[in-house]
Amino acid sequence: MLVTTASAADAPTVTSVKEHQSAKKVIVTVATKYFKIDAKDVGKANKAGKGHEHFAMDKGKYDYPKYSGANGKLAVKLGVQGKYSPSVTNKVTYTGLPKGKHTVTVYLVHNDHSNYANASAHKTITFTVK
């Protein structure tokens, strides 16, 4: 089901994705505009400008409980492990990622887990674990 907003100018948008490394953790945080996380309605009817986020680390390779913790456990519960880590916050913490180059894509999604259709509703960054 596709939910549209009033205009393209106020479409849900990922404005930035940043990573911060500390010890063996990589914290990926997201900033958005025209989008509100709607944790209580995940899996319910879609609402324009609301939903949650999907984080896909290396195309899902590290989206399991071992690496993405509680978000990985939720991925298992939803049957999407190895595809993405769902989140009802603006961040996911990954632990134990191997050293080297990694790519994470963040998607803004509706309550039913479908992606928002506008191009600004997802963003990808690449970083190196040292």
Residue ranges and their predicted role:
Residues 3-6:
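N-terminal signal peptide c-region/cleavage motif recognized by signal peptidases
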